[in-house]
């Protein structure tokens, strides 16, 4: 109500996109369709552009990056990585750190916490952390900033010492969202604090931003 939304329709998949784009007996044709979805939904949105419907950029698989130094808690770090890694087999999760000891401790925690996940989630998480993601060791936080800007992640968390937070955040240019501190996990952005669900993926954070409403 606060956004002025007067109609809500329970439709899903490409059929739902078509219903909104062409209109039906019960759904009025719309001018714009935005929001995340499966590859089939994304393709349906692209197809609707041929019929004069405005849509957003294509959204690929979710991708998350964490910049962490030796002060980060590996237990919570592993949990935050798994929050995103369990999305699906095509997701990508990357730990970017200046600390080899933190990388080792986080790896051990990931192995332990993966065993506690349901098998279907664990399988997806292993793909996101392994073939699609991993850990990158950098010399210092300045290099971490450069790597993060080049990667242009959809979700980015900064888990560094308090006196380094401003330095890192001020240097970050390309990211769908930036979460500061381990008290701001990816789950908070996904479900609690109001960040948009439609965020740029596949490097598009270099040229675009998330969907918001005024």
Provide a role label for each language-model segment.
Residues 3-92:
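Conserved NAD(P)+-binding/catalytic subdomain of aldehyde/semialdehyde dehydrogenases
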Residues 5, 30, 62, 132, ...:
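Short, well-ordered alpha-helix to beta-strand connector turns
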Residues 39-40, 70-73, 100-101, 141-143, ...:
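Short, glycine-/Ser/Thr-/acidic-enriched flexible segments
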Residues 150-214:
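C-terminal core of ALDH-fold dehydrogenases
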Residues 57-131, 135:
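A conserved active-site cap/scaffold subdomain adjacent to cofactor or substrate pockets
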Residues 121-159:
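Active-site rim loops that border cofactor/substrate pockets in soluble metabolic enzymes
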Residues 33-34, 65-67, 94-96, 137, ...:
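Structural motif
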Residues 1-2, 25, 48-51, 80-85, ...:
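Short, solvent-exposed amphipathic alpha-helical segments in soluble enzyme
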């Amino acid at each position: 109500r606060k956004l002025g939304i007067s109609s809500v329709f329970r439709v899903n998949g490409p059929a739902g996109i078509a219903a909104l784009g062409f209109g039906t007996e019960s759904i009025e044709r719309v001018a714009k369709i935005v929001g995340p979805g499966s590859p089939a939904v994304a393709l349906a949105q692209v197809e609707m552009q041929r019929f004069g419907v405005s849509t957003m950029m294509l959204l690929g698989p979710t991708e998350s990056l964490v910049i962490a130094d030796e002060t980060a808690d590996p237990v919570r770090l592993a949990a935050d990585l798994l929050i995103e890694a369990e999305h699906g087999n095509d997701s990508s999760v990357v730990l970017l750190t200046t600390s080899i000891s933190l990388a080792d401790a986080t790896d051990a925690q990931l192995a332990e916490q993966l065993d506690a996940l349901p098998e279907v989630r664990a399988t997806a998480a292993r793909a996101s952390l392994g073939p699609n993601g991993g850990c990158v060791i950098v010399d210092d936080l300045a290099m971490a900033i450069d790597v993060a800007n080049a990667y242009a992640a959809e979700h980015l968390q900064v888990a560094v010492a308090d006196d380094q937070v401003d330095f890192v955040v001020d240097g970050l240019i390309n990211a769908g969202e930036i979460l500061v501190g381990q008290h701001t996990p990816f789950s908070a952005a996904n479900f609690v604090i109001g960040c948009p669900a439609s965020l740029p993926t596949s490097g598009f954070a270099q040229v675009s931003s998330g969907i918001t409403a005024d």
